[in-house]
Amino acid sequence: MTRRFLVAGQVQGVGFRWFVARHARGLGLSGFARNLPDGRVEVVATGGDDAALARLEELLRAGPAHARVEMVERHDEEDDPRVPTRSFEIR
């Protein structure tokens, strides 16, 4: 299963993508995090189990120290061959 998150708030320019990548890798997840032009961060994660994906969502809602997360949207999606399956990338 692939899970896509859209994170809104003060999440760009505060180390959010690096925070996500570090924790996702630690949870054994693959995928990517990238800034969107509208100020949100998109996080796409695959692999691991439901518990790992749920823990990642908790971490996204908390964010790093200098972030202010206002909203996290979650979408379960079919596996996408464009999503990395062996690493977690910062784009």
Name the predicted role of every residue range.
Residues 1-91:
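Intrinsically disordered, low-complexity, mixed-charge
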